[in-house]
């Protein structure tokens, strides 16, 4: 958390997506100015589907904080704990017997997140160094939430089947 807050890393995507957030916040237009040149542009479908920079601009406008600060400082402080919360929930679903497996699972997840920076393309690298980017939010939060929800649905289905079995075995 401290490293994400104090040592924000910058990469090539910042030249487009963070600048897009700044432009949307400062000019009030969405995807109408090319971030590289500052000139007007037609609507680019590929970049128009990237809505996270516009959400960052919205958060910046509502809070009065510069969009770059929101992206590089505020969002890691929100997304990193939120991701670990989802890991806790997944661990609770996988290891619901109350054993020591949940802390071991979370320790292994943390070790993989910290030491998984073996390439610029791993989700661990995106998680800790590019937290504010849509790719990182997808790989490290949205897909994990979907896994958590699927585990939740499976657990509910098992509970429903157990209730039906015990209900049908009761004497009339």
Predicted features, each with a name:
Residues 2-133, 137-141:
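Active-site lumenal/periplasmic loops and adjacent helix-entry segments of GT-C-fold
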Residues 115-122, 152, 156, 171-172:
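Extended alpha-helical regions
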Residues 129-133, 167-172:
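Glycine-rich, flexible loop segments associated with nucleotide phosphate handling
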Residues 143-170:
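Membrane-interface transmembrane helices that cradle and orient dolichyl/undecaprenyl
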């Amino acid at each position: 958390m401290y490293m994400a807050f104090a040592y924000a890393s910058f990469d090539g995507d910042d030249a487009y997506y963070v600048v897009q957030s700044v432009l949307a916040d400062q000019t009030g237009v969405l995807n109408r100015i090319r971030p590289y040149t500052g000139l007007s542009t037609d609507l680019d479908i590929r970049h128009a589907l990237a809505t996270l920079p516009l959400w960052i601009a919205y958060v910046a406008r509502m809070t009065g904080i510069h969009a770059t600060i929101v992206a590089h400082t505020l969002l890691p402080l929100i997304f990193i704990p939120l991701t670990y919360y989802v890991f806790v929930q997944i661990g609770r679903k996988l290891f619901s017997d109350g054993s020591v497996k949940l802390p071991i699972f979370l320790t292994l997840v943390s070790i993989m997140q910290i030491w998984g920076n073996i390439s610029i393309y791993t989700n661990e690298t995106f998680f800790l160094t590019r937290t504010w980017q849509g790719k990182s939010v997808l790989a490290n939060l949205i897909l994990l939430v979907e896994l958590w929800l699927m585990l939740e649905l499976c657990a509910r289905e098992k509970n429903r089947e157990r209730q039906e079995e015990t209900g049908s075995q009761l004497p009339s």
